[in-house]
Amino acid sequence: MADSEARLFDATGKNIGSYKLEVMDTFWKRFMGLMGRPEMPIGDAALFRNCSSIHMFFIKIPLDVIWYGPATPDGHAPILAVSRDVKPWQLSFGPKHTQGCLEVAAGTVPISLDSIEILTASSDRLKATVIPPDYRDVVRDRIQVTRCSDTAAHLGGAAALVHGRAL
């Protein structure tokens, strides 16, 4: 999908990275993934939906993996974890309630990552935001988790909303 992209933002909303996105949306694409590819060019990414773990068998390059949780109807989802520098021939598992992941070249996910926005050629849109570890249990109940500017200062840039009320 040529027109798909992922953009990374810091807590201030500044764009800190953009990726040309390959959506792994068929059985064959998901099965093959990045196997056998000699490199993952900086600026490229692979999106796996409905995926809570990955294998690095026959993959020649290390990757950074951004794991995201369940999306709400308006397309918001929490970033649950970032696995950095996952090496070839390893398995990597997302945290509980992972719904998908974004794979990029190792070392390219900035420490200041606060949110990602994924736009696919089929007009799908997903916005994922980092949530503090103390609030990750909210995801278990599939309650809306999204950025909340009025409490962002004391929660490290993100907060959880439960039925429209900030936690």
What are the roles of these predicted feature ranges?
Residues M1-L167:
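Compact, glycine-rich, soluble single-domain proteins
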